[in-house]
């Protein structure tokens, strides 16, 4: 069994290279800003698209004096720009959610606001429904729109005046949002006529090229600062945008599971090499290995562009020892080769499991207690804000409710990150740019043309931040929102400084309440959420690996649900990894160390899942009745052993339990190989050879991951909840 020789050797490898100790927070944050704000290919055009859409929306709303101008301008920046189809779907979802929120609000208001007790209960119920929708809706953008329309409209019903006027005001806000969505879709369509680039392929190629250049230069012992700087920028930007692009259905490319794995592995290559600075420790004997890896990346780049190329790229022949940096790069590069260049007859698309139809709510919307806990905490924070600004008769503080919505997340790190970005965005957009323009610029403007130039200039700044990675893009949206709330408060430019004061104080009130409620009532540190998600994925993958009966619709639905949940957890782990960077305190260094380890294991787990998907496809495409009984028994035994190994890895990760040994799964593979060769007289068909190849790769990855987790237990880390 040559395929199993490699796992046995690599089990004894040391932990893959880990990033060096992190610098102090302020030093890291300064470097973070420098890297995030550097230009990259396509960034200027993307920022221009944001600016054009927001500016046209502003001109139409101001020209026709529509209420809700600030909300309309904000939603022109909120829609996704990943592709025209995603913008269209996001726009439709936003309008539908806004319409549902408006209908819920108006029905409740008309029925309940006339009596003080029912009015107060209606306010609490509205806040609860808003936050429950934010947590339980499958589309986060739609959930945000649903929650925003409720929390923005509730305070309006506390004011005196005829009901008809308040109903009309709510409907005008809906009209402003619909106008902003329409303008954004039209602008994206216009730009799509001139931009035919494949952003996903281009982004992957740029990252692979940056790694290839550094490897080639290090083989010659002459690494340039420019090459390392470009690599560091890609490491700082991350691959979150590429992950979202990979999830976009496109029949011209590979399936989304394989593309997501490719993106993760390309990002891992960058993450391994970017922090490395000790090139002087590499000897001349390492130069051939470095050059071989650079050549392998060139082949992978050609494979990436030649989508219909059936040529299989052969693995590198590398020694099993040497510097840890080289071992980590070679392992990741081999996983990338498996993802981009699968063996003949090896498919990764599970054709029998069609994508689930899009649903408004998440599958666990009504039985996951986390949604209820989240809604209760969000409702409490919003109710406290509402009670306070009504008690002191300061209605201008109602922006605190908006702050509660846009900073509400489930973990401390993510919440802290959003609160920091919300406050700093409001400070720059509201105080510096908003009040500054009111005092210094607006008195000199007397035409819409001058106001448009000022508006576009501020939007360009916000759009540049918006085109950063997810760690900083939120700051751009909050900068724009704070500026829009001041300058688009009425049908004409505002010179009243009390508007800016009220907005800033409202934001502060919302941040204080969110801190009190979310960080004192059970929110977990982001690194703890990362660990729980990673462990949950191990258990879900173990369940996915177990034998499945053939052809039962209930089983197919269960498989589809498992796939979707595992993919969601992969994305959530990466999102929480970004949030860990914003956690402070004595445990920050330990949290960053845990984060680095999880990010190192994440691509391996993704690759293992990809192989599970491929293996299950072969199981489902052939009826057990059409196979020899010996192969069916051996295949079932092997699937059970894969399930057992993954559960063993989960125990090793959760409890530092090192009792799991790979001997049983290797014996199960030997039985499967013997059954196939014996049944087909040593000439198995291509499908059976592919099953053996995938099974061997699963063993290799599982053994490697188990060895690395056993070699690096989380000493001193808090236990994971069961």
Give residue ranges: language-model regions.
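Pore- and pathway-forming membrane helices of multi-pass small-molecule/ion transporters and channels
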Residues: 23-32, 48-88, 98-103, 120-189, ...
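Membrane interface segments of multi-pass transport proteins and intramembrane proteases
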Residues: 107, 111-121, 443-449
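Alpha-helical transmembrane segments of multi-pass membrane proteins
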Residues: 75-76, 375-387, 397-408, 423-435, ...
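Long, hydrophobic alpha-helical segments that serve as membrane-spanning/inserting helices
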Residues: 2-47, 51, 59, 63, ...
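Hydrophobic alpha-helical transmembrane segments corresponding to the first two to three helices
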Residues: 418-422
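C-terminal functional regions that serve as terminal interaction/effector modules
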Residues: 439-443, 448-449, 456-461, 468-495, ...
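Juxtamembrane or sensor-core-proximal signal-transducing alpha helices
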Residues: 184-196, 516-527
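C-terminal structured interaction module
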Residues: 413, 423-431, 714-722
